[in-house]
Amino acid sequence: MSEETTKERKRPRQRTRASKNGEAFKKLRVIVLCHEDLVPPDTIEGLSAKEVAPFKTEWDVISTLKKMGHEVSPVGVYNNLGVIGNALIEQKPHIAFNLLEEFHGYPLYDQHVVSYLELMKQPYTGCNPRGLTICRDKALAKMVLAYHRIHIPAFAVFHMNRKVKRSKRLKFPLLVKSISEEG
């Protein structure tokens, strides 16, 4: 990093104010990363619950952070990390609140957004890239849990386009799930 870049990344000291219990807390600059279609409007006044439903989580997070006195900027992301990079440069956030569940339409790519935040040395909320990778692979997650003697239901992995032979240790009723899809 050049000297000029280092100077740009220095953050000014923030004002503090008292919380309800009298403790002081720091006013933070927060960027909220969310899908570009889910960036909520400035107000939901006059909108029905059905209209608010798609971006309810984003609205709740942003409005709560603002009510707590933080400076909040939503950042809509679809397939361009440059949008996040620009927000980091322009907003100089203390933290990124990560609400992204996918990148470029792929849920498996959300871990790469978090990796980018780590490369940029940007503090963020949520799980680190390794944790996201493990959690996205149900079989791997179950193997890690079993290794640590955490009880889990019996499972088996069946590969696509291959004949399925049920293991005797699997008893009916059975649930069939994709190894990498949510749900």
Please give the residue ranges for each predicted region:
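A generic structural motif
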Residues: 65-73
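Glycine- and acidic-residue-enriched helix-capping/strand-helix junction motifs
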Residues: 39-57
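Glycine-rich, highly charged phosphate/nucleotide-binding loops
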Residues: 73-92, 107
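A short, GP-enriched loop/loop-strand-helix hinge that lies immediately N-terminal to
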Residues: 43-48, 92-136, 151-154
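A structural preference for short, hydrophobic beta-strand core positions in alpha/beta folds
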Residues: 74-76, 126, 157
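Hydrophobic targeting/anchoring helices
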Residues: 2-29, 40
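Active-site nucleotide/adenylate-binding loops and adjacent lid/helix of ATP-dependent enzymes
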Residues: 27-34, 89-90, 134-183
